[in-house]
Amino acid sequence: MNEQQIILKNKDNKLKKTYSEVLITSFKGKNNSSSILLNNICANLTDKLELTNSFITSEKELKQKIDKNKYKYIISFGQKPNCNKLYIELFGNKNNDRIETSFPYKKLISFMKGNNIEYVISKNAGNYLCNNIYYEGMKYIKDNSLDIKMIFIHIPTKNKEFNFREIVKIISNYIESLVDENCWSYGIISNQ
């Protein structure tokens, strides 16, 4: 867990709970752009989780992390080869079931536009690990009536045409804006 966490106090000014607001995930891999992005994001009040490249293991890892914390948001990243834009995924699919994200993605889109970041709104997260973790994560949240909003963002492989450093900075700033917004809505008293 990051050193900076939200501290909630009750009306008697006694410590209630300390937790991170946002979980950021990627898939493991030395050359996996999602892993590189995850390890370079610098945002307060976040936890990071690198998922194993396995359907079953990655599901277990995500569910265990969710069970141990009280996140407001989960932002998952995966690598999408042969593209130079971000792909904001709206749906996770499995068999004939489709789950739509409840994440406030219109604010994300507005943030991307405001920072001149090219993106695609996608309704197809693929049919491999990325889609599986997205679908299973949203299903777990739904089945357990958790108040967590999840989004999946595909990013290009690291290449000369894609300004990776700029994306790291912008995504870090976006996550900070999410956290700041929630600090006010929770009535946070202090940050440690």
Model-derived segments and spans:
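N-terminal catalytic or cofactor-binding beta/alpha core of small enzyme domains
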Residues: 1-128, 138-149, 165-172, 176-192
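An accessory alpha-helical subdomain
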Residues: 154-158
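Short active-site-adjacent structural elements
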Residues: 159-163
